[in-house]
């Protein structure tokens, strides 16, 4: 028999942010490491061009994506990792996802004011 009143969960939006963070980390961080870690120090990329890009609207969007989504992914992993290790933090979801939300708002204000 199918339950006619299923219990709703707040997890889907969190899983969306978690999945986006993992995908962003896997796809874009190698490129960021290449640019900032190798090309910039060896003078193959001009720092002025990177700064100009960061001040453009698409650059601000890239900064937002590269900072917000991986933080959600990391805090989600920590929250569930602690749960798997039987370390049950009282109101853990509220704490970890609250920290991710505060970080998101902070980054939004910081990047918008660039």
Swiss-Prot record:
Which membrane topology describes this protein? Multi-pass membrane protein
Q: Does the record carry Cell membrane as a key word?
A: yes
Asked if the Swiss-Prot or TrEMBL record annotates the protein with the keyword Cell membrane, the reply is: yes
Q: Name the Gene Ontology molecular function terms of this record.
A: succinate dehydrogenase activity
A single Gene Ontology CC term: plasma membrane
GO BP annotations, alphabetical order: fumarate metabolic process
Transmembrane intervals? 24-44, 50-70, 92-112
Q: Which UniProt keywords apply?
A: Cell inner membrane, Cell membrane, Membrane, Transmembrane, Transmembrane helix
Where located?
Cell inner membrane
| Its biological purpose | Anchors the catalytic components of the fumarate reductase complex to the cell membrane, binds quinones.
How would you summarize the oligomeric state and partners of this protein? Part of an enzyme complex containing four subunits: a flavoprotein (FrdA), an iron-sulfur protein (FrdB), and two hydrophobic anchor proteins (FrdC and FrdD).
Q: What NCBIfam families does the record point to?
A: PRK05470.1-1
**Listed HAMAP family:** Fumarate_red_D
UniProt similarity note: Belongs to the FrdD family.
> What's the name of the protein?
Fumarate reductase subunit D
Tell me which species this is from: Haemophilus influenzae (strain PittEE)
Query: Gene encoding this polypeptide?
Result: frdD
